[in-house]
From Swiss-Prot:
It comes from Escherichia coli (strain K12). Pathway: Bacterial outer membrane biogenesis; lipopolysaccharide biosynthesis. Its EC number is 2.4.1.-. It is an enzyme of class 2 (transferase). GO terms for cellular component: cytoplasm. One of its GO terms (biological process) is lipopolysaccharide biosynthetic process. It comes from the Bacteria. This is Beta-1,6-galactofuranosyltransferase WbbI. Involved in the transfer of galactofuranose (Galf) onto an alpha-D-gluco-configured acceptor substrate to form a beta-1,6-linkage. It uses n-octyl alpha-D-glucopyranoside as an acceptor substrate for the addition of galactofuranose from the donor substrate UDP-galactofuranose. It is not able to use beta-D-glucopyranoside isomers. GO terms for molecular function: lipopolysaccharide-1,6-galactosyltransferase activity.
């Protein structure tokens, strides 16, 4: 069994954190060999990588299994698809995004249907994919891990300090709701326009998220689009299918969360009692303002349990075991 590492760089935002964490978790398995072929860069680098990928795939046999990150850039996908059909080895993509579900068009679902097994985000994404492939070929990761090497520092919790943290890509194109008058969030991330906002605390290295571990009764927010009344637009609608990585970021730091009540991850949050599913920002603020410290501490204890699993890679590890066991019978 092989894991294709397609990375050769890091960034301050969390865009590639999930791929790096998957690599680190897969590297712990004695029966999984990591193959390092960067699939990013300029024209020359892509030509070199195409040759390396083709050479590697030529050596695979029908008993071999290749796990890789999805989506994969088109030229490399075409190479992989060609050798997959030719040599009959098995391929298992770990889905990070499906462009057609966030208004990007394309035919990701058709490509995924050609795979031998697929690692999906959650039941809602699986339901969508099952229109194109057999559901028994789809495994859910439930939530992305967020590996953190150190323990979470103790956070002083008092009812004198309470607030909501929003982290990620702060571009107006993606989350213009944060620029709405009256939205009083503590902000972390890139592409923020109002740098003089005292509640904008800059960006941080995705590998070291301790900066968001602020004192008080703090929550993380999962919300996208241009409205405070609902999640709207392509990015807002995408929450109905995907697992936003910022959810794992917040939980890794033991922060309970607020999430849109129509988001695919809402059931996970509510079922594990690690936050609230809300229909509007106003509803969220009412909960924050009225919450007792006893209630917050109870939710925080639940969050610590999930946080430990996320920080140590339990969710990808569990779904990897499912994939390995299932492929043994095929």
């Amino acid at each position: 069994m092989y894991f294709l590492n397609d990375l050769n760089f890091s960034r301050r935002d969390a865009g590639f954190k999930a791929r790096k964490d998957a690599l680190d978790i897969a590297s712990d398995y004695e029966n999984i060999s990591v193959v390092n072929i960067p699939l990013w860069g300029g024209v020359v680098q892509r030509i070199i990588s195409s040759v390396k990928l083709s050479t590697f795939l030529c050596g695979l046999e029908n008993k071999d299994v290749l796990i890789f990150n999805f989506p994969m850039a088109k030229p490399f996908w075409h190479i992989l698809s060609f050798f997959h059909r030719l040599l009959k080895f098995r391929i298992v993509p770990l889905i990070h995004d499906i462009d057609e579900l966030r208004g990007g068009g394309g035919s990701d679902s058709v490509r995924l249907a050609t795979c031998d097994m697929v690692i999906s985000h959650n039941p809602q994404m699986t339901k969508y994919l099952s229109k194109y492939m057999s559901q028994d070929k789809i495994k859910d990761i439930k939530i992305f891990d967020y590996l953190v090497s150190s323990d979470v520092e103790h956070r002083d919790v008092t009812d004198k300090q309470r607030g909501v943290i929003y982290a990620g890509n702060l571009s107006r194109h993606k989350c213009s709701f944060i620029y709405t008058e009256g939205c009083d969030f503590t902000l972390f991330g890139v592409n923020y326009e109002n740098k003089d906002n005292p509640k904008y605390l800059g960006s941080f290295d995705a590998q070291s998220p301790e900066k968001i571990n602020l004192p008080g009764m703090q929550f993380g927010l999962i919300w996208d689009g241009d409205s405070v009344e609902t999640c709207s637009g392509a990015f807002g609608d995408y929450l109905k299918f995907n697992n936003p990585h910022k959810t794992s970021l917040y939980l890794s730091m033991e922060l309970p969360v607020f999430i849109w009540d129509k988001a695919a991850l809402a059931d996970f949050i509510v079922d594990n009692r690690i936050g609230y599913a809300v229909g509007s920002i106003k509803e969220m603020q009412e909960i924050v303002d009225s919450m007792t410290i006893e209630t917050y501490k109870q939710i925080s204890e639940n969050t610590k349990i999930i946080s430990q699993k996320i920080r140590t890679g339990s969710y990808f590890r569990d779904v990897l075991e499912e994939v390995i066991d299932d492929l043994k019978t095929r």
